[in-house]
């Protein structure tokens, strides 16, 4: 179970929402055999298909980084990225081989940011206070590590920096 397909699909979701303006996003293959595109995989262990095992996929958890936190009626917020000198990076919310970020405000007032790290190395991500003020963010991470499936990995306040492991997805939820 790796993040390869999960990251690829997360990048598609990001582009569909950020650039194509998609208002919803669905995945049609929920369960399947040994297919890379099944959210849940089933494996038979006998020739009569009477016994087997069922496993979740990293793809399911990557989709969950969006679907668990971004609720119906949410509004997408603009995201700006700056380099180390403070200069604005055009289209900085999308480095297809690095960090991709989208942000949302749910109807209940909670904020959500989904950050994809497509790179093969750890990246830093700073949360500027901007319109969200001094928000406390819960961090959830999905990565190649066993058990790191929307795993709560700590909190961070606006204005601080978050380390995002290589080839992982984090969701930050704040109020």
Predicted features by range, described:
Residues 16, 63, 113, 139, ...:
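Hydrophobic, well-ordered secondary-structure elements that form the walls
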Residues 27-31, 116-119, 142:
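Active-site-proximal beta-strand/loop segments in catalytic clefts of secreted hydrolases
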Residues 152-175:
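C-terminal beta-strand-rich structural cap/linker in extracellular carbohydrate-active enzymes
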Residues 32-37, 120-123, 146-149:
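Flexible loop/turn segments at secondary-structure boundaries
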Residues 86-135, 167:
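Carbohydrate-binding surface patches
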Residues 130-148:
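Solvent-exposed beta-hairpin/edge-strand motifs
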Residues 1-90:
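Aromatic/acidic polysaccharide-binding cleft in carbohydrate-active enzymes
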Residues 71-78, 134, 159, 167:
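Glycine-centered loop/turn motifs
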């Amino acid at each position: 179970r790796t993040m390869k397909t999960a990251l690829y699909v997360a990048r598609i979701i990001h582009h569909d929402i950020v650039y194509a303006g998609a208002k919803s996003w669905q995945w049609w293959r929920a369960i399947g055999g040994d297919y890379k595109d099944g959210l849940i995989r089933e494996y038979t262990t006998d020739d009569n298909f009477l016994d087997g095992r069922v496993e979740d996929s990293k793809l399911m958890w990557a989709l969950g980084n969006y679907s668990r936190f971004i609720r119906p009626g949410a509004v997408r917020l603009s995201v700006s990225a700056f380099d180390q000198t403070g200069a604005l990076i055009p289209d900085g919310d999308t480095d297809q081989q690095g960090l991709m970020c989208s942000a949302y405000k749910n109807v209940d007032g909670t904020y959500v940011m989904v950050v994809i790290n497509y790179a093969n190395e750890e990246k830093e991500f700073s949360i500027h206070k901007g319109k969200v003020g001094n928000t406390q963010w819960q961090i959830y991470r999905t990565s190649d590590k066993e058990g790191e499936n929307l795993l709560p990995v700590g909190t961070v306040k606006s204005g601080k920096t978050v380390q995002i492991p290589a080839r992982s997805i984090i969701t930050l939820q704040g109020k």
